[in-house]
Structures are given as C-alpha cells and as structure tokens.
Swiss-Prot record:
<keyword id="KW-0694">RNA-binding</keyword>
<keyword id="KW-0699">rRNA-binding</keyword>
<dbReference type="GO" id="GO:0006412">
    <property type="term" value="P:translation"/>
</dbReference>
<dbReference type="InterPro" id="IPR002222">
    <property type="entry name" value="Ribosomal_uS19"/>
</dbReference>
<dbReference type="InterPro" id="IPR005732">
    <property type="entry name" value="Ribosomal_uS19_bac-type"/>
</dbReference>
<dbReference type="GO" id="GO:0005737">
    <property type="term" value="C:cytoplasm"/>
</dbReference>
<dbReference type="Pfam" id="PF00203">
    <property type="entry name" value="Ribosomal_S19"/>
</dbReference>
<dbReference type="InterPro" id="IPR020934">
    <property type="entry name" value="Ribosomal_uS19_CS"/>
</dbReference>
<keyword id="KW-0687">Ribonucleoprotein</keyword>
<keyword id="KW-0689">Ribosomal protein</keyword>
<comment type="function">
    <text>Protein S19 forms a complex with S13 that binds strongly to the 16S ribosomal RNA.</text>
</comment>
<protein>
    <recommendedName>
        <fullName>Small ribosomal subunit protein uS19</fullName>
    </recommendedName>
</protein>
<comment type="similarity">
    <text>Belongs to the universal ribosomal protein uS19 family.</text>
</comment>
<dbReference type="GO" id="GO:0015935">
    <property type="term" value="C:small ribosomal subunit"/>
</dbReference>
<dbReference type="GO" id="GO:0019843">
    <property type="term" value="F:rRNA binding"/>
</dbReference>
<dbReference type="GO" id="GO:0003735">
    <property type="term" value="F:structural constituent of ribosome"/>
</dbReference>
<dbReference type="InterPro" id="IPR023575">
    <property type="entry name" value="Ribosomal_uS19_SF"/>
</dbReference>
Length: 92
C-alpha cells in the first residue's frame, strides 16, 4: 500500500543530520545507516550510504533515479545461489 501524500515521505530524523554533516564537511565518506525503511530524498543525491543488510553494510551511491525509493531496495538481504542443477544433464 502506498503512503498518503499528505503525510509526506518517511525519513528517520538522524539521517538528515548525518547527511547534512557530511555534505558540509565536503568529504565523500560512506554514511553507515540501519534505516532501510527511510525514503531517499533529493538532498541525498551524490552521497554514498552504507545500508545494512543484516550482515554488513552495502555501499549505495545515490543517483537522481533513486529519489522516492527506499534504501532497503538497493541492499538485498538474501543471497541467491540459483536452483539446483539437473543431475541427469550434469552427467552427460
């Protein structure tokens, strides 16, 4: 279900402060975050966030196409190893 327009996008409060601090310092460092549920805002474009996937932080460089999406969409939590190979086809 989509969030109501009148509520606006959800972003954890500490995230705005961290992004502003990095942007004002001028250094392009990875901002470690655990908030996968936060929406990517236009002021985050050009910054790199380390989004936690449950095991480690995955670096995500924010571009304009990502605005409006959630951080969690860009850091997969599950590893896909593929389906099991067909044993008959493997023997030939």
């Amino acid at each position: 279900m989509v969030r109501s327009v009148w509520k606006g996008p959800f972003v954890d409060g500490y995230l705005l402060g961290k992004a502003e601090k990095v942007r004002s310092s001028g250094r392009n460092e990875v901002i470690k975050i655990w908030s996968r549920r936060s929406t990517i805002l236009p002021q985050f474009v050009g910054l790199t966030f380390g989004v936690h996937n449950g095991n480690k932080h995955i670096p995500v460089s924010v571009s304009e196409e990502m605005v409006g999406h959630k951080f969690g969409e860009f850091a997969p939590t599950r590893t896909y190893y593929g389906h099991g190979a067909d044993k008959k086809a493997k023997r030939k």
